[in-house]
UniProtKB/Swiss-Prot annotation:
Protein's name in the database: Glutathione S-transferase A2
PROSITE patterns assigned: GST_CTER, GST_NTER
Annotated GO CC locations: cytosol; mitochondrion
SUPFAM superfamilies cross-referenced by the UniProt entry: GST C-terminal domain-like (SSF47616), Thioredoxin-like (SSF52833)
CDD domains with a match to the protein in the record: GST_C_Alpha (cd03208), GST_N_Alpha (cd03077)
Top-rank lineage group of the source organism: Eukaryota
Catalytic activity: RX + glutathione = an S-substituted glutathione + a halide anion + H(+)
Tissue expression as described in the entry: Expressed in the kidney.
Keyword Phosphoprotein appears in the UniProt entry: no
Lineage, uppermost ranks: Eukaryota, Metazoa, Chordata, Craniata, Vertebrata
Subunit composition and interactions: Homodimer. Heterodimer of GSTA1 and GSTA2.
Length: 222
């Protein structure tokens, strides 16, 4: 029997959080080995575990996978969260790319220089309210199902829920004009595996604080 996937990353959200979310939604238990010092990262590099000398890295099925999208694609395929055919997969990919674009925009706000934060936060809110959330509200309305693609859970539902929770952290009022997205959020949050991941004490990570940012800067030298 194969062991649990092992996730190598800093003890924070970053580019690993969507991977944690997808594994959790699939009901897959995983272990985490946190990179806590520059030496930890250097050892992974010297041991040949990081193809491009960067994390996240996931050990799964005898492989050491890097690149977030490649990891997500593998997990989604392995656990049947990638649609039933090529057309569904194309929609899933298209929606996912938009979700990840906004997720990254919001996630980067905490790292903005103070003199840029107000403007970039305003831009993120504008894109959220006027570009991305209307697009997904429209998808839910036209598709008429509980899920974004097909009639069962896929990876894109998990990614969208994660994004909606980040939007709430940014400004909860941004969701107010979108009743279908609000209902979607409640519906997906109530799925047993997702509900468990949302419960305190899970491997879900909180927003970055100043201390974590400083520790990350020391480890990753950015």
């Amino acid at each position: 029997m194969a062991g649990k996937p092992v996730l190598h990353y800093f003890n924070a959200r970053g580019r690993m959080e969507c991977i944690r979310w997808l594994l959790a939604a699939a009901g897959v238990e995983f272990e985490e080995k946190f990179i806590q010092s520059p030496e930890d990262l250097e050892k992974l590099k010297k041991d040949g575990n990081l193809m491009f000398d960067q994390v996240p890295m996931v050990e799964i099925d005898g492989m050491k996978l890097v690149q977030t999208r490649a990891i997500l694609n593998y997990i989604a395929t392995k656990y049947d969260l990638y649609g039933k055919d090529m057309k569904e997969r194309a929609l899933i990919d298209m929606y996912t790319e938009g979700i990840l674009d906004l997720t990254e925009m919001i996630g980067q706000l905490v790292l903005c220089p103070p003199d840029q934060r107000e403007a970039k936060t305003a831009l993120a809110k504008d894109r959220t309210k006027n570009r991305y959330l209307p697009a997904f509200e429209k998808v839910l309305k036209s598709h008429g199902q509980d899920y974004l693609v097909g009639n069962r859970l896929t990876r894109v539902d998990v990614h969208l829920l994660e994004l909606l929770l980040y939007v709430e952290e940014l400004d909860a009022s941004l969701l107010t004009p979108f009743p279908l997205l609000k209902a979607f959020k409640s519906r997906i949050s109530s799925l047993p595996n997702v509900k468990k991941f949302l419960h305190p004490g899970s491997q879900r990570k909180p927003p970055l604080d100043a201390k974590q940012i400083e520790e990350a800067r020391k480890v990753f030298k950015f």
